[in-house]
Amino acid sequence: MDPCDCAKTGTCNCGATCKCTNCQCTTCKKSCCTCCPSGCSKCASGCVCKGNSCGSSCCQ
């Protein structure tokens, strides 16, 4: 459970102690960090979401 790589303005740790702030993970673990907009019901593995936009490949 490696930490997510987040934007410089945010922090994200998907380890045992899950903490996410302004998270824009490039590797999203939905169970830990809600990195995609609320409209996304599920994050695809390895999806990349920027800001409030979410590509079709990100949501399943």
From Swiss-Prot:
SUPFAM superfamilies assigned to the protein according to its UniProt record, in alphabetical order: Metallothionein
Keywords in alphabetical order: Metal-binding, Metal-thiolate cluster
Positions of a divalent metal cation 5 binding: 33, 35-36, 49
Xref: InterPro entries: Metalthion_dom_sf, Metalthion_dom_sf_vert, Metalthion_vert, Metalthion_vert_metal_BS
Keyword hit for rRNA-binding: no
Matches recorded under Gene3D superfamilies: Metallothionein Isoform II
Name of the protein: Metallothionein
Binding site for a divalent metal cation 7: 49, 54, 58-59
A Pfam family: Metallothio
Molecular function as annotated in GO: metal ion binding
Residue positions binding a divalent metal cation 6: 36, 40, 43, 59
Record organism: Rutilus rutilus (Roach)
Binding site for a divalent metal cation 1: 4, 6, 20, 23
Residues annotated to bind a divalent metal cation 3: 14, 18, 23, 28
Family membership: Belongs to the metallothionein superfamily. Type 1 family.
Region (Beta), start-end ranges: 1-28
Region annotated Alpha, chain positions: 29-60
Residue spans crossing the bilayer: none
Binding-site residues, a divalent metal cation 4: 32-33, 43, 47
Residues binding a divalent metal cation 2: 6, 12, 14, 25
Domain notes: Class I metallothioneins contain 2 metal-binding domains: four divalent ions are chelated within cluster A of the alpha domain and are coordinated via cysteinyl thiolate bridges to 11 cysteine ligands. Cluster B, the corresponding region within the beta domain, can ligate three divalent ions to 9 cysteines.
Matching PROSITE patterns: METALLOTHIONEIN_VRT
Protein purpose: Metallothioneins have a high content of cysteine residues that bind various heavy metals.
